[in-house]
A protein has these predicted regions:
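Terminal-appendage/accessory-domain detector
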Residues: 15-28, 35-260
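Conserved catalytic cysteine-centered active-site region
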Residues: 1-10, 74
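Generic structural signal for well-ordered, non-membrane alpha-helices
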Residues: 5-8, 32, 96
Length: 260
């Protein structure tokens, strides 16, 4: 298993330590490549787009004309999406829809009778672990994250995905109420959540990460996530640096990181 994930990124690793390990290898290799480049280590400068290069090797049907070094177009991120929950990206639209249902008083633990979550077929076999056995598997389970939201746990907090949480009786009771459906015509950024609650009419809650991202007030939620991962004092120092945009430097942020 470790050999396979060190050689490539595999969906079979989802729900195990192999997945973040693979991402860590990629980050480590990026740093190593930058350091080697600084030392004038020589490689094919067009290794990405040349004949038999990275793009052609991994996607033989790709039109290499899209990758044209002579145009000198800059490579940039066209947007930044924030990961506000400590779990697989495929669960995020469902969590946002469930949060809306929670706000509208549809998700009391005693009142929920059944919830059906419908998502794109692209998430089948990725984050649809029905009965997670570990906290890591919970990060890839619609059943588990729905139960967390119903029970009022913070989906941005690491301790919501500790192994001992799988023994929580109330979480297990709520997981039994969840069903998951897949629709091949749905965008992978979209989720539909139909809630059946006692004394309330059936209601469908929807969320599309592409279309509704601006509706999310990211700043306080990112701060909440930072506090859950670090601590309030460290987060306070970081945010005081970031709030002074005119004087905030990479060096200052680097010093903050080294202080850990």
């Amino acid at each position: 298993g470790l050999v396979s994930t060190m050689a490539s990124g595999l969906k079979s690793q989802f729900g195990t330590m192999g997945k973040p390990f693979n991402a860590g290898i990629a980050a480590s290799n990026a740093v190593k490549a930058a350091k080697l480049s600084e030392l004038n280590f020589i490689s094919n400068p067009d290794g990405l787009g040349s004949s038999q290069g990275f793009i052609e090797t991994h996607s033989p049907n790709t039109h290499l004309s899209v990758y044209n070094r002579s145009t000198r177009l800059p490579f940039r991120f066209d947007k930044v999406n924030y990961k506000l929950h400590a779990c697989c990206h495929g669960l995020h639209a469902a969590i946002e829809a469930l949060n809306i249902a929670k706000t509208e008083k549809y998700l009391s633990p005693q009142g929920v009778r059944a919830i059906n979550i419908t998502v794109s077929s692209s998430w089948r076999g990725v984050c649809d672990i029905e009965k997670p056995q570990t906290g890591l598997q919970g990060k890839f389970s619609y059943h588990y994250i729905a139960a967390l939201v119903i029970c009022g746990f913070n989906t941005a907090a690491l301790d919501s995905f500790f192994d001992e949480m799988l023994a929580n009786i109330e979480i297990n009771n709520q997981m039994r109420k969840i069903t998951v459906s897949f629709n091949e015509n749905m965008e992978d950024s979209y989720s539909s959540v139909i809630v059946h609650s006692e004394g309330l009419s059936e209601k469908n809650f929807e969320f599309d990460l592409k279309k509704n991202q601006k509706a999310i007030d990211a700043y306080p939620r990112l701060k909440d996530k930072a506090e859950s991962l670090l601590d309030k004092e460290k987060t306070k120092t970081l945010y005081s640096l970031l709030s002074d945009k005119d004087n905030c430097s990479a060096q200052a942020i680097g010093s903050w990181i080294r202080a850990f």
